[in-house]
Amino acid sequence: MRITRHTAIGLLAVLAFAAAGPATAQGRAGEPVQTKPDVCLPPERLFDGDGDVTRNRKALGSRDLCLRLDVFSEGQLRWVFQIIQNKKHAAGPLWVVPHDDEDVAFDSAVYAVLRYGGTVVAVERNGDRYNRIGKRKQDPNRNFQVRGEGKCRLQLARSPQFTRNLMRWLHKGQPVIALHTNKAGYDLVPEPDEEKSKGNVSIGIERAEDSHITEFPAARPIRAKSPNDTLIYVASRQKPGNVAQLSRFVAALNQSGIHVLYEHVARNDCSLSNYAVWRNLPYVNIEVVDGDDTGAQTRMIDTVMRLIRSGQGPQR
């Protein structure tokens, strides 16, 4: 048989495809591809650019969980969400991991969704905190769009699709629980750019009189790698002390050894906490220092869920 140049190119393409290994409609493990409706992926097929899934592979292999990818573009930004849903107890909290460089937060989310149900939405950025376009970058936690409002200062553009795709996993009446890790210590002058900051989430910071953050330190803090960086954020449009239910929640956290930062939201900054306040959603942010290996974050999750289930959460 005479092999023409065209035939040779075709044969090479077939051989290259075969060498690449089997593929499915969901794409290979190395390619983030939108998961089809009603399809659940095994852990080894869930796109994992930085080892989060690999590190939690055994737990994520539970038959109770359904793993998916949500892949979409909005403006110039391409987004990949890892969706982890508890099929047996879907009507639970929405666990949000906005930053892909915060490994402990992802691990805690897997623990939480298995124990308490609901759905995890984790932003997958190959281990990067930001979604980048050249020299510009978007912090996922400054990309929550309140309907009818314009672009916030730290947004590259308005983000209704990002917000809709993430928040659609929230069941009515359930809380939004953000999971984060943070740098040890803090900046004397607040620095919003995390890449320049020495830390901005701590208890015991000397704050300006007009600060929108009020500290409620615990008398006997729980065991943690860095106790002053181990805390819970709550948020409200009302000043501290003006919302009885939220005040009781803060007091109960303090009694359980958990520091609390109370954010008085006067102006929307497109963070998840501000979005939740504007939408009147129950919201908690659970923070530990980077690399905490004491289990402090999962213990705080247990405390928060105990209070919520007993009617002592941030909202009734």
Which residues does each predicted region cover?
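Bacterial N-terminal signal peptides
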Residues: 9-19
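Sec/Tat signal peptide C-region and signal peptidase I cleavage site
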Residues: 21-25
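Structured catalytic-domain cores with a bias toward divalent-metal coordination
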Residues: 26-316
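Bacterial N-terminal signal peptides that target proteins for export
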Residues: 1-9
